[in-house]
Each structure stands twice: as C-alpha cells, then as structure tokens.
Regions:
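Periplasmic/extracellular loop-to-transmembrane helix junction in inner-membrane transport proteins
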Residues: 2-8, 12, 32-79, 238-248
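Amphipathic cytosolic juxtamembrane alpha-helices at the membrane-cytosol interface
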Residues: 7, 97-103, 163-164, 168-195
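Membrane-embedded alpha-helices of multi-pass transport/permease systems
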Residues: 26-30, 83-90, 122, 135, ...
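Alpha-helical transmembrane segments of multi-pass membrane proteins
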Residues: 65-73, 77, 109-116, 161, ...
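Transmembrane-helix boundary motif in ABC transporter permease subunits
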Residues: 76-109, 122
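Glycine/proline-centered hinge or cleavage motifs at structural transition points of membrane proteins
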Residues: 85, 116, 174-175
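Generic hydrophobic transmembrane alpha-helix motif, especially the helices
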Residues: 110-145
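Interhelical loop and adjacent transmembrane-helix boundary motif
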Residues: 211-259
Length: 261
C-alpha cells in the first residue's frame, strides 16, 4: 500500500476517534445540563431549599443539604491534603532524600492514585466499625483527604521537579536555608501546584464511592462533624432511579450543580 494512502487512512481514523470522544463528552454533559437546567428553570428554589419530611416520596424540598455537605467535606479535606501533600512533595526532592528512595516513594503514590476510590471508603469504614462509630461528616473529610493526597502529591512533586536547578543553586550560593530555597522553588512551581490542587478537589467533589460508606446519607442539613452528611454524588446515586419523577428531578438538578462546581 502506498505510504501516502496509509497516512491518509491514519488521519481519517484520528479525526473519527477525536469526533467520537468529543461527541461522547457533549452527550454526557449535554443531557445532564439540559435536564438539570429545565428543573432549575421550573423550580430555582431547589438549590436553596432544605428537604422536607416526605422528600424521598416526592414531597417538597430541595438539595441544599447535599450542596452544603459536599462543600463542608471537600473544602476541609482539600486543605488537609494540600498541607500534607506539600510537605511530602518537598521531602521527595533531592535536597532532602536520595534519588533511589524518592523514586520508590513516587511509585507508591502512583499506585495509590490508581486504587479505586471505593477502597478508600472501605478502609475508613473498617476503622469506623472497629471504633464503634457511625458514618459522619468527619469521616467523609478524612476519606476525601486520603483520596486526594496521591493526586496532589504527584502534581506538586512534578511541579517542584520542573524548577531549574539554577534557582536552587543560586539560593544556596546566597546563603539561603533549605526552607528559604523551598519557598523560592514553590513560587516558580505555583501554576503546577495549583493545577494539582484543582485536580484533587475535582476528584473529591465528584466521587460517590469513597463517601457512600463513610459520610452517611441523611436527608437533613449537616449538623456537626460527628453527624451524617449528604453529598451531591451520593444524592445523585440514590435518587436517579427513584420511582417518583420529582425525586429524579432532584438528581438532575444535583448533576447540573455538580458539573458547574
């Protein structure tokens, strides 16, 4: 076969593949945005209304409890994970640890990144069972912090590794301490660090499997770290197949909110 014909065939296949991926993405996002948008246009109060007493039976109420639950779980867990991940990423640099050991630790975090999120949930669930505790907002925060950590660590590590050695060498030649050198490197690596934080936060915000066992799934507003708390992904999972059309509408509204968050 002529090499130009081969090249043309591969170009066509690449274009078709790209089109299929884009069409699939548009369909997934489009269906949820359209259906969720229709629900919000008909009843915009659904996002600022707490669920009523007969919420799961098609009664009055909205998804405010799940929105607040997601925010109260994701924001603290991201803060905890960022602080721990930054220290770990700094430790992985050649200034603090030998290259062979740092490479082994990177493999560990790569493996942790690939572990299904439900495994994190089961791990925390076992701890709750051993300590005779129920699912709660606090347990959800810990679960999501662990879930985000491998993602944020690897992004921060790669961002810090991309800092030119000249910056570190210049800092040391001027008498800077390791801490001062790390701060200088962090400023240079800030875009990559922020990207890692956003990736970790996005993974936590959209994950249902890890918190379905640990945070509980009540229909009440969050009341404390030791109390159960709903979240948007879990609400979607539970209500998307409901017999009541009004309950299914809550799931579409939650999908719309989750996409734009």
């Amino acid at each position: 076969m002529n090499k130009y014909v081969k090249e043309s065939i591969f170009k066509v296949l690449m274009v078709i593949s790209v089109f299929i991926v884009i069409a699939y993405l548009v369909m997934i996002v489009g269906i949820n945005v359209v259906k969720g948008g229709i629900v919000l246009i008909k009843n915009p109060a659904v996002v600022v209304t707490a669920p009523g007493p007969k919420y799961l039976l098609g009664g009055e109420g909205g998804i405010l409890h799940a929105i607040l639950g997601s925010i109260l779980m994701v924001v603290p867990s991201t803060c905890i994970s960022c602080a721990a991940s930054y220290l770990i990423a700094l430790f992985l640099q050649v200034d603090y640890i030998k290259n062979k050991l740092s490479n082994k630790l990177r493999v560990v975090f790569d493996v942790l990144w690939g572990i299904p999120s439900i495994i994190y949930g089961i791990f925390i669930l076992n701890i709750l069972i051993i300590t005779n505790r129920r699912g709660s907002l606090g347990a959800g925060i810990i679960t999501l912090a662990l879930l985000q950590m491998p993602v944020i660590v690897r992004y921060m590590d790669e961002a810090l590794n991309s800092v030119p050695n000249g910056i570190r060498e210049s800092a040391y030649s001027l008498g800077a301490t390791r801490l001062e050198t790390a701060i200088a490197a962090t400023k240079y690596a800030l875009p990559g660090i922020i990207a890692g934080i956003l990736m970790g936060m996005g993974r936590a915000m959209g994950d249902a499997a890890s918190v379905i066992f640990t945070s509980g799934a009540g229909n009440s507003m969050p009341k404390g770290l030791s109390k159960s708390a709903a979240s948007l992904p879990v609400l979607i999972f539970q209500q998307a197949n409901s017999f009541y059309p009004s309950v299914r509408e809550h799931a579409y509204a939650a999908s719309f909110v989750l996409i734009f968050i």
